[in-house]
Amino acid sequence: MKKANDRQSPPKLLEKKRAKAPEQPTPPIQEEPEPVSNVLQGDDILALAIKKEDLTKQHIPQFEETGEKPVVTQKFIIRKLKPKDSCKRVYHLVAHPANPDATTKPLDYSGPRDSFLSSDQILPHQILGSLQDFKRIAVARGNTQLAKLINIQPCLMTLISAKEEPKPKSPKEEKRPPWAPPLQHNFLKNWRRHITLRKKQQEVLSEHLKKPASELLMNSGEGYRKIQEEREAIDRALPTQHDRKAMNCFWSPLEYLGDEKSGLLMTKKKKQRGLVEPITHIRKPFSIQMETGLPVQKDAWYRYTWDRSLFLIYRRKGLQNIMAELDFSQQDIDGLEVVGHGKPFSSVTVEEPLPLEKSQKSSSEDTVFLDSLTNLSDMVPMPILGPSLLFCGKPACWIRGSNPEDKKNIGIGVRLTFETLEGEKTSSELTVVNNGTVAIWYDWRRRPQQDFFQDLKQNRTQRFYFNNREGVILPGETKHFTFFFKSRNAGIFMESWEFGTHPTLLGGAALQITLHAISLTQDIFMDERKLLESKLAAHEAVTIAQSVLQDLLRGVSTPERAPSPVDAYLTEEDLFHYRNPRLHYQHRVVQNLHQLWQQYTEAKASQEEALNLRTPTVPLLFVEKPPDHSRTLASEYPQLQPHQEMDTLKDPKNSLLPQKTGISTKSMQRKSIMEEILVEEGPDRENTRSPRVLENLPPPKWNLCLEDFRQAVMTFPEELQREDALIQLNKAAMELCQEQKPLQSDLLYQMCLQLWRDVIDSLVSQSLWLRSLLGLPEKETVYLDIPDEGQKSPPVTEVKVTSGKLGKEDRRGGAQEKKQLSARDKEEKKGSKTPSKEDRLNSKKQKAKDDKKVVKSTSRDRLLSEDPPADSSATSQEPIDPLVMEKYTQRLYSEVYGLLDNLVIDMMVLADELGSEKNVEEPLRFCT
């Protein structure tokens, strides 16, 4: 029954429900549900048990496949769209972000490798060099497969040798016709093409954005240049007004790049110095604006731009006169247009003269009629009753009752201007329209023109060409008269023609056409001329500079430099070489000979005094030895007179001894001086001296001649003394015969010595600084003048020196003098036991005899005999705080440790560097 009821139609069910609805007056009573217990019973527990059958249904066991799997094929239907037509495709460029791994990959510069074989041909950008050279090398190496991939144009195959491939015939270049435009005119085509694309782009954007083209963002900066020029003009005019803005940069000081002592001084710019360049005006003419599709449109009134501010308007009015003076080249750029250089040019200019007073006397009807015709011509182009023409846009009408005197005047003047190069042709048109109702007959009449150079013109060549035959212009017809100009010669040419009409228009006033042409010379040698002018200008500048410099040098007269005395640089070594040309000078050996000479001369003098014997001796030449053996003073030797110098220079044959090899012309002068010394110190002069004078003179010194030394030794009376002297003399001569080879200086020793000196200097400076900082008393120094041998020591002067003025050189000198004085004391004690040490000490003493010696206050114990000043004793007795002294010593110890640490590090670094260099270089050897 339920199934039967379910199959009944929906309308029947609705009717039954409506019929049963009134039979249910009360809703059924809801029974309360019985409480359900949460405790599971035994049946429920058994029902929850898991059976194996249920598990097998859920998890089907997978058996291993013993045979091959059955192939199951399925068919799918795929819907493919038809490709669109290629002509309707639109390509868009989409920018995608770069691959992040692209930057990490190293660039491959190994070349194309095998990419040639995969492609059909090799492109020029795939190789370095030209394709011709690449193919030639490939063919030479026998790689024909690679050579086939190179496709070269036939005109470039001529570079390949004839043995490899036959030479193809290169096509002949076709000559361009003379009337063809030059290739430089292609930029006009590109300009027009780009302008067309720009116009299309503007139209699309303006339609899409619903904005005019002038308000687009791409055209928003058209007026920015004008605003910048106006700002610059106002900024230049503001310094003239006293409104707190002036050219502060003009009065500002110069800037430094870095420090004022070691930096660079920055010069001012031209603008800061007042040298301002004129304002350059850049605009777009009206023709260019129309060509680019930018009509001149004014901004809306509600746009409050910079140039519309009230402050700017008042500022313009206040600076109007000054801006006009500063920027006086304001031109109407809207009317300018670039025609081109050397391009034929033509223009038409119409001039309508003012009405004369005589024409005003004509009837009022004619005047009213003429005005009405003019107004009609300006408003609506409608035909005019009677004869009338539009001559180049100007109305020329028939006037009744014309005055015969008006025929002398010009009614309408037309000027046609031509400009072209010589030999080229240009043209211009003249338009005449018959806007009346009457046919007008016309003819051309050439007007006479006054020529001021008739004698110079030999032939009259025609240069203007046009159709000058008469004709008729029908009503409503338009005539175009084309005028051509061509001239073989450069110059300015002019012709005047009159356009005659019948009936006569404008009361007989002439319709004049003036042809004005300019023919320019083509400058063929412009580049060569400019190059020549630049060379001449440079040559002129160099010539002028040289002439000015020569004039200045001639005007400057510098006095000649006083020649230094030729004998000012004679040293002991030079005298020794002159006396003994075959021997080599050694300072130690020569000093030993000096001591030996002094020793034997003193012994001989004592013997002579004891015996009172007068025996004839060999005359000797004695030369006073200067305090410093390294040089001889000019006062020791007599100066040569000018005439004697000239004689010695002119006659070099007067030299007594042969010259030594390698001696220059200066040695000639030295030898002549030595000859003078020989003459003045000769035996005759010694004999002329009186005995009293000889007694008062000090003992003679050795004249550095070994032969004289030997002769003097031979005069000794005792044979033992003579033999001993000869042995020592022969020993010294043997040493002097050997040439002394100087060794290379020890670089490491010198550098370490310099570092040690720097450490000592820095230590002394730190000590002085600590003393001044802690308030300790200043130390004293004593200056001592050490006299020469045989002289009495002058009194010692003790001077107090402040720590700030104590220099490094004084401290070094004090330390060195300490060593010399101690060595000298030891020498006096030892005597002649150690001759080698005496030689070294004597050499040191000879180098520093004339210098002042500085000794510390600790050396005053040796000078107790002298009277010290009172101030020194007072300062030495001042009490010193032990705490301050302890602090001073601690600080000084720390400084010493730091300085010594740095010294050791520097020495190690230098030793390592020099050691690495010595490993590469050769070992030290004697200089040959």
Swiss-Prot record:
It comes from Rattus norvegicus (Rat). Pfam families: MYCBPAP. The gene is Mycbpap. PANTHER family: MYCBP-ASSOCIATED PROTEIN (PTHR48421:SF1). One of its GO terms (biological process) is chemical synaptic transmission. The modification Phosphoserine is found at residues 557, 564. It comes from the Eukaryota. It is found in: Cytoplasm; Membrane. Transmembrane segments: none annotated. Expressed in brain, retina, testis, heart and lung. Not detected in liver, kidney or intestine. In brain, highly abundant in CNS neurons of the hippocampus and cerebellum. Strongly expressed in cochlea and vestibular sensory epithelia. In both the organ of Corti and the vestibular organ, expression is restricted to hair cells. This is MYCBP-associated protein.
